[in-house]
Amino acid sequence: YLFTVAVASFMCISCTKTQTTLSENEKTVNPPIMGWSSWNAFRVDISEDIIKHQADLMVKKGLKDAGYHYVNVDDGYFGKRDDNGIMHTHEQRFPNGMKPIADYVHGLGMKAGLYTDAGNSTCGSMWDNDAAGVGAGIYGHEPQDAQLYFGDWGFDFIKIDYCGGDVLGLNEKERYTSIRNSIDKVNKDVSINICRWAFPGTWAKDAATSWRISGDINAHWGSLRYVVGKNLYLSAYAGNGHYNDMDMMVIGFRNDSKVGGQGLTPTEEEAHFGLWCIMSSPL
């Protein structure tokens, strides 16, 4: 654990640096988002009941009061697009559609998140053989999907993956900027996460509130060390309202194939949590 101690010491020393003057923007603190996402635990096997139950538990267990305000529905809610290109939700998993999900989460005093891909198809369609994700990406449907997700359904956050975009060889900056512009026309307060599995570049600050800096995390110590190492020299690119995303946390998993690893020891989990906090990653 010398690696953990060394990194923690370095970051804590860095955190002691203070500024004597603050701009008006800096006086408004916009910390990294904190919440729950369905992907690690369920992948595409999600449902209306699962999401609502998780939201209830976040309130009951005190997570909401601790600042975990986002309930994010990841890949798996898609049904199909109709002849007009309108996205419909999965009839079995979400028979009542997605607006009731957002309304339910909002009713508990929290915010609701959603998922899409910058290309034609989602990661779940490729890695989990979820046929419903084929053609479900936002590519070619930006204004239409933005209105549906954030205007009609009322969601507050979106994770934008890149499996479909990568397959098509699309330009990342152009794609994410186009999506950002379409969302802004509906709701400028939507929080956007770029999930591109590497630091995208300085342009990301204008397109998103957070961005992944590495490949997917797995539930073993070597994977955590890799992610921390990737993020160690990226602190200059993060700041108030714009953060390096070290990926969803893998605490509580034991020998679970969905998160690829044997799981972390309690001490490793503590280090995991602490490092994500020290490095200002979304939780």
Model-predicted regions and their roles:
Residues Y1-T21:
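Bacterial Sec-dependent N-terminal signal peptides
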Residues D156-F157, C163-V190, I194-A198:
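Extracytoplasmic, non-cytosolic globular domains
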Residues Q19-K52, L57, L148, V190-S191:
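N-terminal module-boundary/linker segments of secreted carbohydrate-active enzymes
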Residues Q54, M58-G169:
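Aromatic-lined carbohydrate-binding/catalytic grooves of carbohydrate-active enzymes
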Residues W39-A41, G76, D117-S121, C163-G165, ...:
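Active-site beta-loop-alpha junctions enriched in small/polar residues
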Residues S38-I46, H88-E91, G165-D166, L264:
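Second-shell loop/turn segments in exported
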Residues T28, P32-S38, G67-D74, K111-T116, ...:
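Structural recognition of the beta-strand scaffold that forms the well-ordered cores
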Residues H141, D189-L283:
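Glycan-recognition surfaces
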